[in-house]
Amino acid sequence: NQRTDEYGGSFENRARWPLSVLKAMRERVGDGLCIDMRISGDELVPGGMGIEETKAFIRLAQEYIDTVHVSQGLIVEPRYMPYTMPAFYLPHCHNVKWSEQVKADPDIHIPVTVVGSITTVAEAEEIIASGKADMVAMARQLMCDNKLLYNAYRGMEEKTRPCLRCHECAPADIVHLRCATNPRLGRESEIPEELPCAKHKKRVVVVGGGVAGCMAAKTLVERGHDVTLIEKGDKLGGRLHEISCLSFKFDMRQHLRWLM
């Protein structure tokens, strides 16, 4: 913001425009609608907002909003987007350090939501139980497997397909929504949520125990076929073993375990 009028320069001036927008929204919808504001704990851009200015702005904005949703990075700067939508080389729950600081501010009185690479119910429960946030937001993991909460409730967490955080779904605003591991995403009208049992049970041989072979075998079994999976090597999973060997590729190792 390089403006020199009443909307630029000092913190108060720079806050004027977004506060006027939030005020107008609240006046328009009244108290019957919850307004959630997403904001970065740290924009990471030189000269951008850091956590102290973020907290200062939330203190002003809380008059007009019901909850604040803490992220990181700046979406208008592509090089900082991997922090806004954390890729697989960043740690899980990496925005919690910002939501924790917002929660600890004695002058912020509204509920705090945190988002960013929170992919399991266990991670979400730990964040909330430790007081680092009041709520947790998930997006990619639920696109990868919308039965996350159902499986957790039933004690079947191991059945949940883990998100790779690979960003296959990221260009959804310009192309059809897709997922690297969930073939149904974006094709819900074509592929039923529960695959029907085959009309005629068959004995099927799948040759090759790589990722595609394992997935084909799992799907065939779900449809009721008698499946034999043949792999020339000594382990299933194919190239995923080599790809996931680096320490930061935790999500791919999780996917490998899920496949098995």
Put a short name on every predicted segment.
Residues L240-M260:
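N-terminal Rossmann-like dinucleotide/flavin-binding domain of flavoprotein oxidoreductases
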Residues N1-V207, V211, A216-E222, V227, ...:
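Flavin-dependent oxidoreductase catalytic cores
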